[in-house]
Amino acid sequence: MARLGRTGFLTLAVVFHLIYAYSIFDIYFVSPIVSGMRPFRVEREPGSEAPAKRLVLFVADGLRADKAFELTPDPDLPEESNGDDLTFLAPFIRSRVLSHGTFGISHTRVPTESRPGHVALIAGLYEDVSAVTTGWKLNPVNFDSVFNRSRHTWSWGSPDILLMFKEGAVPGRVDADTYGEELEDFTSDATALDIWVFDKVKELFASAKKDPELNAKLREDKNVFFLHLLGLDTTGHGYRPYSKEYLRNIKLVDQGIKEISQLVEDFYGDDKTAFVFTADHGMSDWGSHGDGHPDNTRTPLVVWGSGVAPPKQPQHGVPSGHEDGVSADWHLNQVQRNDVAQADVAALMAYLVGLDFPTNSVGQLPLEYVDGTPREKALAALANTQEVLEMYHVKEEHKKAALLRYRPFEPLASDYGNSAEQRLAMIKDLIDRGFYEDAIETSAALFATALEGLRYLQTYDWLFLRTIVTFGYVGWIAYALTTVIHLHVLHGASESDRTTASISFFSSVLVALFSVFLYQGSPWRYYLYGFFPIFFWEEVFARRKAFHAGRAGALLLPKRDLHSNKVEDIDTITYGGAFMLLTGLLYLLFEDEILGTSHQPAAVSRKGSRNIMGLQLGMVLLALIVTRSSAASLQAKQGLPFGNQVVGWGVLIASLLLPFAHRLYPNSHYLHRLMIIFLTFSPTFIILTISYEGLFYFAFCMTLVTWVRLEHATYVYTAKPVAKQAQETIEPPKKANPGATTVVDGETYRFRTLTVSDARVALFFFFLLQSAFFSTGNIASISSFSLDSVYRLIPVFNPFSQGALLILKLLIPFAIISANLGILNRRLEVAPSALFMVVMAISDVMTLNFFYMVRDEGSWLDIGTTISHFCIASFLCTFVAGLEFLSEVFISGVDFGLRTDAITASVPDIVNGITSKGQKDVPNGVEDKE
């Protein structure tokens, strides 16, 4: 309600936007996982067996497809070589492509992170995008997988991947041998991780020669061996994928795979082993992944061994797979390239070893990789299609049971003569009559239709939920504008006007919505989604007189993506730190001229404050020195010296605590307070910067100070004629408007009414807020943030601590802008939070636009970008509310040099939610207060 006042309004804004920001995951990214499906496997002739008895899966975490196949300068040559000696880094893998198996590119989905990538490879399932938040935790995999369908799986590698698959499988079915997380050091030689895995595999087969029980277990069929090779991912993060370290790691992985393949073949000696080599995701040029850039989504896929089709030469007039030009410099044009979706790999592995297809798999068996008769391929395609249809039928039954009225998917509805059972019977008849190619084509068409049916069920509730959310956002915009007009234009003069009919109407709609949610067993969040639109529009209707009295304009804000593909540059870091240091020194030297003599504090207080500021400058200098030393040591691959790490943490913590010492020697001038805040965060920005961010911080702070002074000068200039006219009038001064008051530091002050020119201030703030978001890194793609800076404090893999440091760096510009706007708010003599409320009212025009632009299919880059855009726009309002509270902390006790009127009488505080109705007139006696 408009009576909520300032604190209530800001709290409501935060709660509403946090809840509605989650709505895209309830609408667009509902988990596809269901249970209760029957498993399906390929039907084989009596006495026949699966193509392979066992399967070995190699996953090179973070390996790009191009780096695996292209010609590259030999990383082992000395530095002085001219670089003309080009070589293939993975000769063994290349030999499998050319003469032993089938290859292609496995295209991944966003988020290109380890957990979703491995889930797609091993379960054939694309998790919803929000599942990336569990990628760094030990979390049971609550869906079916190839490991779960195997007789037994042995796995080696990182605990982040192996343990979650072990916990989610049938007890005792998966063995996971992992190394400690302390080995995942980004500043050390990560090849040790892969060597550890290869050595453990060799130990297992060596032990089998002495252990008859283990030997017998290893020789059973339907076994899977999983080697998770994390070295490339760790090396790529630390040194970039074009570094010699990354290229050497590729050579080591290739040699290790060669040795393990030979070891397995020698141990069994039956040529009944299938081998799969791939990656969970790629790696960008700046050593990160997560978004949909092609370098992250293209991974190699090489399959060879028992049951795998040999390499095929491209036929004239038939697509070779190389038409897109991606593999033009791989020198593999003489071999057919067969690209697949990442989830297809799970279906391929299940087929090769004769397992049931994972029941949640949406992967389509790539028949180009299968070495079998046309009948075998037709039966395999049929079983693959039956598995997906089974998932469709189960999900459809769940949907029917939950809805008041269900409309079936026409292409698979029996009412329309298109039942899946009829089409399956037709496929079986084609196989029985020997029309295998027709059966394969029909199965593929039915498979695609089943996926469309799953898509139909996944999006069934979209229209209903999106309509509710749209009414919620539009209602918030109208409610916020009504509140601003009521509080800061009409000063509480408008009254609510509810009628019995309006109360009955809105109550009936709310009851109807809640009844539908209750019948359908909807999550508790749906009730909140439905409550907010009713609440907002009921308030807008009740305050419609205030809305009609004001004038609201639609503000369209241009927006663009900024990309920040940065590399570490010590000189640029130094320039930024030098500007920060120079700014502080110049302030200390010319403090009297900057502040003016009329605002000088007591001599003791002035000296103490200058001494503390001198210590802050010392922290800036020390941060610059230790950052240069740490960066040089890391670039020289000497690791992070322990002393540097201790000093870095000491400077970071001390610089954030030192400003509190200024309370002992207060200097209340607003420029002095801004300089303290500037120097407080300077050491943090120096330590956590890798390139131009320090220069941005300096320029951003100077721009904000200039903006504050310019807006105040503009306000004084435009108000001067009015003041002069007031002095010349012979009429007695009018009483102060009792509605235009607020409480500041325990006293009541007069504030002015908002005008059209204040929209300019709000727009400038909105622009600067966008700059704070995007200038230190493209938050639309979190992978654009480099980890180089956090290595100076945390060199060992610790995602939560490293992420916290990156978030701290990201939030600093918001702290700076909140302090400046808080000061500007007071200098312009408008009510606290007035400008913040205007910004919150206009920001959701952009939010609603991005809500309808969210996509959950198509280009993976588009999916990730649209989600990020919506979340950024939605959280902007939440940030603004938080910044408003933060600004009060930063400007507490600041002297603004204003002529404000202290009102001696006790008056209600409209901004804090009390109406002016019945308020007594305020006395004329006002007292100038500096």
Curated annotation (Swiss-Prot):
GO cellular component: endoplasmic reticulum membrane
Subcellular location: Endoplasmic reticulum membrane
InterPro entries on file: Alkaline_phosphatase_core_sf, GPI_EtnP_transferase_1, GPI_EtnP_transferase_1_C, Phosphodiest/P_Trfase, PIGN_N
SUPFAM superfamilies: Alkaline phosphatase-like (SSF53649)
Membrane topology: Multi-pass membrane protein
Segments on the Cytoplasmic face: 1-8, 488-498, 543-569, 633-639, 706-761, 825-833, 892-930
Disulfide bonds, paired cysteine numbers: none
Molecular functions per Gene Ontology: mannose-ethanolamine phosphotransferase activity
Pathway assigned to this chain's UniProt record: Glycolipid biosynthesis; glycosylphosphatidylinositol-anchor biosynthesis
Residues in compartment: Lumenal: 30-466, 520-521, 591-611, 661-684, 783-803, 855-870
Record key words, sorted: Cell wall biogenesis/degradation, Endoplasmic reticulum, Glycoprotein, GPI-anchor biosynthesis, Membrane, Transferase, Transmembrane, Transmembrane helix
Main subcellular location of this protein, as a coarse class: endoplasmic reticulum
Residues bearing glycans: N148
Family: Belongs to the PIGG/PIGN/PIGO family. PIGN subfamily.
Name this polypeptide is given: GPI ethanolamine phosphate transferase 1
Native organism: Emericella nidulans (strain FGSC A4 / ATCC 38163 / CBS 112.46 / NRRL 194 / M139) (Aspergillus nidulans)
Upper classification of the organism: Eukaryota, Fungi, Dikarya, Ascomycota, Pezizomycotina
Gene label: mcd4
